[in-house]
């Protein structure tokens, strides 16, 4: 994690990783971030081959900060995660835990837009990172084979480009549940 690289022992960790890479024991070095601002320091400290970061229709910070484009231009692979915001974006409206009620406007609009346009939530969620040429990989979690097959099918649906900007939030309590 980034915090381990940014503390006093960070330089020793980076040196050890670089030695492993120079010996051919490690092919690529990557970092997993929670906030694109972490990259401000990390890119100065080490040569990064892969960045794993959250990216979804609510948390677009990697793209809007300009880091997605910068990483791509520098040949750094971007692997995105939290595509479904820890599953919240796939839950029926009534199943979203009450601790997320303060964002009810977002959930209500999301539910209405999906219903109004006859859209599948998984397809919409996957279409955002998959539509970005700067994204190398989209990481998703699955519980079983049927769910995996369903998500593969959802990822293959070509959706018309739609503006989901009403979903965006910078509230860390929402985007980092």
Predicted regions and their residues:
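Beta/alpha (TIM)-barrel catalytic core signal, keyed to glycine-rich beta->alpha loops juxtaposed to Asp/Glu
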Residues: 1-169, 174
